[in-house]
């Protein structure tokens, strides 16, 4: 049984703003690469208890896709502790997707949060 949550605009905001790692796959039923990538995403969701996996159907949620600047599908977004760490378009091969998941988990979030705070302070 897959551990993937379907998100809409309201649930997206709460899902990505909390603690922990959330990987979001923006997809569409008519998208060939999305269908190719789906088993890779599902396998990762079943094997990685340290990460929350979610999907957004862009046809059911066009406003969310627009707000998230999704211009092609599939688009992957990786959030950790409420901060967007990665966004890319295109289906990833299994090994590359696993590398992305490991890299997101290995990020020093104290350093990232310090950089975000410094940037916000400099912008007034």
PLM region descriptions:
Residues 3, 27, 52-54:
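Conserved Rossmann-like nucleotide-binding pocket used by diverse enzymes
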Residues 4-22, 62:
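A short beta-strand-turn-helix
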Residues 19-20, 27-30, 72:
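Short pre-active-site segment immediately N-terminal to redox-active cysteine/selenocysteine motifs
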Residues 19-21, 36-56, 62:
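Conserved helix-turn-beta segment immediately C-terminal to the redox Cys motif
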Residues 26-40:
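Conserved redox-active cysteine motifs that mediate thiol-disulfide chemistry
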Residues 72, 78-111:
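Non-catalytic, surface beta->alpha helical segment in thiol-disulfide oxidoreductase systems
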Residues 109-124:
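CheY-like receiver
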């Amino acid at each position: 049984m897959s551990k993937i949550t379907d998100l809409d605009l309201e649930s997206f905001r709460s899902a990505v703003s909390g603690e922990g790692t959330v990987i979001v796959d923006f997809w569409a039923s008519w998208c060939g690469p999305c269908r190719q990538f789906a088993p890779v995403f599902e396998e990762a969701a079943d094997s990685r208890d340290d990460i929350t996996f979610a999907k957004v159907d862009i046809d059911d949620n066009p406003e969310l896709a627009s707000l998230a600047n999704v211009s092609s599908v599939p688009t992957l977004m990786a959030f950790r502790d409420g901060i967007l760490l990665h966004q890319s378009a295109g289906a990833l091969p299994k090994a590359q997707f696993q590398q992305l998941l490991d890299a997101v988990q290995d990020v020093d979030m104290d350093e990232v949060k310090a950089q975000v705070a410094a940037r916000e302070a400099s912008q007034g």
